[in-house]
UniProtKB/Swiss-Prot annotation:
Residues 258-270, 300-314, 329-362, 401-436, 498-525, 688-712, 957-973 have a biased composition (Low complexity). Keywords: Coiled coil, Nucleus, Transcription, Transcription regulation. Pfam families: KIX_2, Med15_C. The gene is MED15A. It comes from Arabidopsis thaliana (Mouse-ear cress). Residues 110-158, 190-207, 241-257, 271-299, 315-328, 363-374, 437-448, 567-588, 716-728, 735-749, 756-815, 1148-1160 have a biased composition (Polar residues). This is Mediator of RNA polymerase II transcription subunit 15a.
Length: 1335
């Protein structure tokens, strides 16, 4: 064969223009028929499920036909290629069961001297679309079929691949016979045109340009500079392993096998464990002593799907032993590729099933795209390549991880191998940074990573040349697919940091493999990794400002990162079709539908993700408790695991990135949302996230250092008993649970709406789990690492609420628990630290006791003041008891004290503690002496206030003021009515008052918020006179002032609150004032009060708020008014200054659930009112000339909202005032018509049913000032009318309004006429002014 066969030139004599002519002459329906035929063939050989599978097959067939159509030279070539493809599929199906294991050893007799000749043929442009070599059609077709045969390094090459010139006919026959059902051979051969150039350049560092053919280099090769550096290091390392030990039997390999070995490994360059062993003897046969490796490539011609490794253990063992017999002198190096040269796929053992499935998930969805790859669908190859290009960084890091492990394993081998270990150690050091970068990658590509690791793990076993290690192959596979449970075991139990565990932690279906993984990690000898990795973790965190000193235990950081990945940032188990189907459609559809689906999922994420995370954390904590050795509840544990897995799937769905949205997901978004809503309805916390709460960074100035330290202690008290018990037991998940627990407990302090998932941990630990003395000792030691250290850490956590779930939240636990490192040897040093910290703890507690006694005296004074104010609040108390009784909480005073002492627990709605849920205050306080000595009611209250810790109060609370005194009082939200989504929290003063009076339950705040606004703090101030105990002046003086005037409290509160809170308060006050004015039937006067009520949504919702306010002020204290006094929509708006301005707000407001008494009373006399109204209108029309009053139909309403007025309970009659201008002179009429002057528009009013007791309401907007345009007569008349209307007495009559409107209209017309000389009026109307006066 000559080299012309490889050139992409057209056959001799065929004009280039003919390429397009045959396409235009092809009948339009013939292509569709061909696509249908291809699809029918695909259906025979590929499994598919439902319409999605059919659509997938249709897309594949269409894209395949399009590629053939665009690449064919003529119609005959087009049909021939498609026929060959289909024939190959049929042949593959028939021969799927038969294939030989390896190329006969007789081929080894060929000399290697012909390699340079073969190299010369692999020149630039060595690909052709011309399949003119008839003697080898099947091999050519095989090469075509395997553009996408699963080789992770191959790109979409032209669809038709002629034979490799360097392979003889004899070799071709052998390959065809042995690989009829293995398309990987062609995939190996496709990149042969440039592989030797690449191999030679691998010694030149990251410069990877292929000789003369940069355009044909795969995209993955262009994007992986770091990968090639790693490959270079591996090459050099393997040379060190082989030099001096192995001769160079170049005569063992035939030239075509040498060439194919290059082609086999280069497309699989992502498998870095394979690539290090790639020999370069084809280019530099005298430089690299890697012939034993080359000899093993004899069998790689018959090894399809190197990436999936679908072989059986037994065959691998036989194959390895046979290869070792063939090459005894290269036993150590030969194992590297023995398992890669896999046998046919016809027998897949159960051990290999899961790796196979994972690789199928990489290639496409679960409907069988993997098999389509075997049939040579170029489309699938493109999908795979697109997806793999997005995953290059992750795969890079995974390869570095595998390389490290592959070099660590020989540590346990004989000394001969240990002598060669230093290069591996050096390379391990050089690869730490890349390994660490892995932990910051999103873990959404786990399935690809897992499948990618399998061949590398197999290389680990065979690299040392010890066939007995094959017994651990199952464990190695499990290393490729570790789960959360596996991580917990091998990280905490052995003090290891498993990079693979980090990569694939979200595959919980493999938890039963924990013991084998554990033992295998011990065999691998990876104990050298943790120190380096932990140092790097510390350096990275310190560089990002997340570590303030050397107090950060590396193991806790490791666990923290894993937990954060689990709960916040991962895509644990997306449906198998999610990853690659995105790559299929991303380029085709342009991402339009992706954006739409992504926005839907984003909105769902904002709505549901906080609740799901809350439930997930609670379940995870519960799972940790129940997994302790003392509690053997296997069934319940299994249910919890399943429940957690379902939660992970939901969170992963909500956290899907835009690039990973697949077409199938588009139709399932609504279904998933329905499932999530149903799930949340069953398991949602009883109170949603409170609105209007400030982040904790704004709460920090309100707290004294003592309060912060107490908060930190209470946090540790929740988690330290559990961690102590687990440390003493030496349980595997100890470090995982402790870090996760601390992270979650700290998240509480900065995630306002998320309940603490493990708040009941201390109460659920049996007493037996805490050995005598150890629990308290550990608590005391960890509670106070240093007094100032705790305070600083608390401030750091509180001021970083936004990033509490991205790593900062565990800093406090790490600071307070320096002894929880990855090694169990530190427990001896731990006890020494505990003794020292115990002394600090006691000193701190003594100081704290003195402050608490002072606080107790202040509490007594507050109780006395509250007792005096109790009588005035009795009615409100009863109302609030009615509300809170629905919660069924019944938290007594003593229980409430325990409830509050648990740090953040009082801030979350799910903690409805039962008596005895907390074992004792002593346990919570860590055997604090002041708790046992001062358990009086005063101390109870004092501790409650002191222990609230980082309170999260409403954003508009006027009581959040810095206090210069030493009283560490700070407002804290309590549990409020769970049925009110916007319920604001009570102030601490109300909490103290509740305890003093023994009131059961948590009192509902008087300021009931609404979805659109935050609750009014001024109303809260008015309705809670005892709330002044928290005002700054009161706290400063230390003595509540009983004689303080309400106006002083008001002024001080207004000065202390934020503009948003003040706006909300004024809006609520204005709403109530205007509502009272409307019910009374009087106008607001100048309109300033009515103009305040702007938020009508809030006005219609805050029923209890307005009622309590009016009851406080004595306006409407009757029960009837309480039931009926609601901020009703203003349809009967009182005539007044700015009532018309407010009309649009009222017209669009929600339907009131209650009516005003005035409106309901007027309904009874509606017929009488209408009769009297008609009589009055008739009388008005008799007296007025230019103004006509008439009853307007609803159809005449210019604004459709007017029609809705009568339908929302405010019935009345619409009256229209029309200015007909009959008194104008003909000259003025002609002038107005000639200038196209707009006439004065009619004025519409709504006469209520209560008329004449109620004033009519304007339906037209009244202008605030006169328009500057002289021609706008209507605007001028309305402006005048607006001014004169305010002088009318209340209630206004229709007659007075009509007279006023008529006078305004005449005055405007008169002014307009005077601009034209004043002579435009007839002398008959010369006494215009007198007529107006007489009327």
């Amino acid at each position: 064969m000559d080299n012309n066969n490889w050139r992409p030139s057209l056959p001799n004599g065929e004009p280039a223009m003919d390429t397009g002519d045959w396409r235009t002459q092809l009948p339009p329906d013939s292509r569709q028929k061909i696509v249908n035929k291809i699809m029918e063939t695909l259906k025979k050989h590929l499994p598919f499920s439902g319409p999605e599978g059919i659509n997938e097959l249709r897309r594949i067939a269409a894209r395949f036909e399009e590629k053939i159509f665009s690449g064919a030279l003529n119609q005959t070539d087009y049909l021939r290629k498609i026929s060959m493809k289909m024939l190959t599929m049929e042949t593959k199906s028939q021969n799927a069961a038969g294939s030989s294991a390896a190329i006969p050893a007789a081929n080894n007799g060929t000399s290697i001297d012909s390699i340079p000749t073969n190299q010369g043929q692999l020149l630039p442009g060595s690909l052709s679309t011309n399949q003119s070599q008839a003697p080898q059609p099947l091999l050519s077709q095989t090469m075509q079929n395997n553009t996408a045969s699963g080789m992770t390094g191959s790109t979409a090459l032209p669809s038709s691949m002629p034979p490799v010139s360097s392979i003889t006919n004899n070799n071709t026959t052998s390959v065809v016979n042995q690989n009829a059902n293995m398309q990987n051979v062609a995939g190996m051969l496709q990149d042969s045109s440039g592989q030797h150039g690449l191999s030679s350049n691998m010694f030149s560092g990251p410069q990877r340009q292929m000789l003369g053919r940069p355009h044909a280099m795969s995209s993955q090769q262009q994007q992986q500079p770091y990968l090639y550096q790693q490959q270079l290091q591996q090459q050099l390392l393997k040379q060190n392993f082989q030099s001096g030990n192995v001769p160079n039997p170049n005569s063992l390999l035939p030239s075509h096998i040498q060439q194919q070995q290059q082609n086999v490994l280069q497309p699989n360059q992502l498998h870095s464990s394979q690539q290090p062993g790639v020999p370069t003897s084809a280019t530099q046969p005298s430089t690299v002593n890697s012939a034993p490796l080359q000899g093993l490539h004899t069998n790689q011609q018959s090894s399809p799907q190197l990436s999936s490794q679908q072989t059986t253990q037994s065959m691998l063992r036989q194959h390895q032993s046979s290869m070792l017999r063939q090459h005894p002198q290269s036993q150590q190096a030969s194992g590297i590729h023995q398992q890669q040269s896999s046998l046919p796929q016809q027998s897949i053992s159960p051990l290999q099933q899961q790796p196979t499935q994972l690789m199928r998930q990489q290639a496409a969805n679960s409907s069988g795209i993997q098999q389509k790859q075997m049939m040579g669908q170029h489309v699938v190859g493109d999908m795979q390549q697109q997806h793999q290009q997005r995953l290059l960084n992750q795969q890079n890091n995974v390869m570095n991880i595998q390389q490290q492990q592959s070099q660590q394993q020989p540590l346990q081998q004989p000394q001969q191998q240990q002598k060669q270990q230093p290069p591996a150690q050096q390379q391990l050091m050089s690869q730490q940074n890349s390994l660490q970068a892995t932990h910051q990658n999103p873990l959404g590509t786990q399935s690809n990573v897992a499948g990618l690791q399998q061949p590398q793990q197999q290389m680990l076993n065979s690299q040392v040349g010890n066939s007995s290690l094959q017994n651990n192959q199952h464990s190695v596979h499990m290393l490729s697919q570790p789960t959360v449970g596996l991580q917990r075991t091998h990280q905490a139990g052995h003090g290891l940091y498993s990079s693979q565990g980090q990569q694939s932690q979200n595959q919980p279906s493999q938890q039963q493999m924990m013991p084998q993984l554990q033992s295998h990690h011990q065999q691998l000898g990876l104990q050298q990794q943790p120190n380096l990795l932990q140092q790097d973790v510390q350096q990275r965190l310190q560089a990002s400002g997340q570590v303030t000193g050397s107090l950060l235990p590396p193991q806790n950081v490791v666990d923290q990162q894993r937990q954060l990945y689990q709960s916040q940032r991962t895509l644990p188990e997306m449906p198998s079709s999610s990853l690659d189907s995105t790559a299929q459609t991303e380029s085709a559809n342009g991402g339009d539908w992706q954006e739409e689906v992504y926005q839907k999922i984003k909105s769902m994420k904002e709505t549901y993700l906080p609740d799901l995370n809350e439930i997930y954390q609670r379940v995870a904590a519960k799972l940790q408790q129940d997994s302790m050795p003392q509690q053997q509840r296997s069934d319940q544990l299994e249910k919890l695991r399943q429940f957690k897995t379902m939660l992970e799937r939901m969170i992963q769905f909500l956290s899907v990135s835009k690039s990973n949205i697949m077409p199938a997901l588009k139709d399932k978004v609504a279904y998933y949302e329905k499932q999530i809503i149903g799930f949340l309805n069953m398991h949602r916390p009883r109170k949603p996230v409170q609105q209007g709460q400030l982040p904790q960074s704004q709460m920090q100035p309100m707290q004294q250092p003592q309060s912060q330290t107490v908060q930190d202690q209470s946090h540790d008290n929740q988690t330290n008993p559990q961690m102590q018990s687990m440390s003493m037991q030496g349980a595997g998940p100890r470090a995982q649970q402790s870090s996760m627990t601390n992270m979650q407990s700290n998240v509480l302090s900065s995630r306002p709406g998320v309940s603490a998932p493990q708040q009941n941990i201390p109460s659920s630990i049996p007493a037996s789990s805490l050995e005598s003395g150890q629990g308290n000792t550990l608590n005391n030691g960890q509670q106070v690492a240093m007094g100032s250290m705790q305070q600083n850490t608390s401030q750091l956590v509180n001021n970083s609420s936004a990033s509490a779930q991205s790593g900062l939240s565990t800093l406090q636990s790490n600071v307070n628990q320096p002894q929880l490192s990855s090694s169990l040897l530190q427990h001896q040093h731990l006890k020494q630290q505990q003794d020292q910290q115990m002394q600090l703890k006691q000193q701190f507690q003594q100081r704290q006791m003195q402050q608490q006694q002072l606080q107790a005296r202040q509490q007594q004074q507050q109780q006395q003041l509250q007792a005096r104010q109790q009588a005035a609040q009795l009615q409100q108390m009863n109302d609030m008891n009615d509300l809170t009784s629905r919660q069924g909480m019944n938290v007594s005073r003593g229980m409430f004290q325990q409830h509050s002492m648990q740090g953040q627990r009082a801030n979350y709605p799910l903690q409805q503690l039962k008596p005895g849920a907390v074992s004792s205050p002593q346990l919570l306080q860590g055997a604090s002496p002041q708790m046992s000595q001062h358990l009086s009611p005063q101390v109870d209250q004092k501790n409650t206030v002191n222990k609230m810790g980082t309170p999260l109060q409403p954003a508009n609370s006027p009581f959040v003021v810095p206090s210069p005194s030493s009283t560490p009082l700070a407002p804290s939200p309590m549990q409020v009515d769970s049925e009110k989504p916007g319920s604001s929290s009570l102030s601490m003063g109300n909490i103290a008052r509740q305890q003093a009076t023994g009131m059961q339950g948590v009192v509902q705040s008087l300021a009931i918020g609404t979805p659109g606004i935050s609750a009014s703090p001024l109303l809260q101030e008015f309705t809670s006179p005892d709330g002044n105990i928290l005002n700054s002046s009161t706290i400063t003086s230390g003595k509540p002032s009983a004689t303080e005037l309400p106006i002083e409290r008001l002024i001080r509160a207004v000065k202390s609150i934020s503009p948003q809170a003040l706006s909300s308060a004024v809006s609520d006050i204005g709403s109530v004032v205007s509502m009272v004015d409307r019910i009374a039937g009087s106008a607001p006067g100048n309109g300033s009060r009515a103009s305040v009520g702007e938020d009508l949504v809030a006005m219609t919702k805050c029923r209890l708020q307005a009622r309590n306010f009016m009851t406080q002020e004595g306006m409407m204290a009757t029960k009837k008014m309480k039931r009926h006094t609601t901020a009703m929509p203003l349809s009967v708006a009182s005539l007044g200054g700015s009532v018309g301005d407010n009309y649009k707000q009222f017209a669009g407001s929600e339907t009131s659930d209650l009516e005003s008494t005035a409106t309901s009373d007027g309904k009874k006399a509606r017929t009488e009112t209408e009769h009297a109204l008609l009589e009055e209108i008739k009388e008005i029309n008799q007296r007025l000339i230019d103004t006509v009053v008439e009853i307007s139909d609803d159809e005449d309403a210019a604004d459709p909202s007017e029609v809705a007025i009568s339908s929302i309970g405010c019935e009345g009659t619409t009256v229209r005032f029309s200015f007909i201008a009959v008194s104008l002179s003909p000259a003025l009429k002609a002038h107005l018509s000639s200038t196209q002057m707009s006439p004065i528009q009619p004025l519409r009013l709504l006469v209520p049913c209560s008329y004449p007791n109620g004033s009519p309401s304007l339906l037209d907007k009244l202008p605030v000032e006169t328009s500057k345009e002289n021609e706008d007569l209507s605007s001028k008349a309305m402006a005048r009318f607006n001014i004169l209307l305010r002088s009318l007495s209340q209630p206004m009559s229709l007659k007075d309004i009509a007279k006023t409107w008529d006078a305004c209209a005449r005055a405007v017309i008169c002014e307009y006429a005077q601009q034209f000389g004043g002579g435009t009026f007839s002398s008959k109307y010369g006494t215009w002014e007198k007529y107006v006066a007489a009327s």
